[in-house]
Amino acid sequence: GGSSNSAAASTSTAASSTAASAAGDATAAANDPKVTLVYAEVNPLDTIVGQTATHFKEKVEELTGGSVVIDVQASGVLGSENDVLDAILGGSTSIDMSRISAFALTSYGCNKSKLLSIPFTFENRAHFWNFANSDLAPEFLNEPQELGLPVRGIFYGEEGFRHFFTVKPVSGIADFKGLKLRV
């Protein structure tokens, strides 16, 4: 079968809860100068997004001299993306940040995020990263806060591109007419 190189990017953002206590309880912070933040990830650590979480943890701890510790909870042990976001929205202080896919954010009214999940939005990885590093990208990262959600997008991640395998060649969106898709 054929496959399309102009596939849809599966994008995600790391979302940090602005409602969660940044330094935890004030008394605890005074007694322990370290701040531990819980990072929820639905995928295992050996995936690209799991590796991104690990890299984020290492960089934060390095750049803060260890005063901020990131506790990565992977493999969905804290729930699905929607479970995690619901917990954050409900005021949970047990989760401080999570990687949330652009598609998952659409369930919470983030309509700009839908654009990031449409097939053929990006021609290739370079095209996606040109967008992610552009002046337009913050509009998407800031959308949850603009809608009043207590989360902040802090970076883009790329989970890879979707590839479509078919009996007939696919070179553009029109070629999908009549095809059944399974994801």
What are these regions (language model features)?
Residues 38-54, 75-79:
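Extracytoplasmic "Venus flytrap"
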Residues 30-32, 49-52, 79-87, 94-97:
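Conserved N-terminal glycine/acidic-rich loop preference
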Residues 1-36:
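Short, low-complexity disordered leader/linker segments with a strong preference
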Residues 24, 46-71, 135:
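Short, polar/charged alpha-helical segment
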Residues 58-61, 91-94, 101-183:
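Contiguous mixed-secondary-structure segments that line small-molecule binding/active-site clefts
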Residues 70-75, 100:
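Surface-exposed patches in mature extracellular/periplasmic domains of secreted proteins
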Residues 36, 67-71, 180:
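Residues at or immediately flanking beta-strands
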Residues 73-86, 170-171, 183:
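Short helix-initiation/N-cap motifs at beta->coil->alpha
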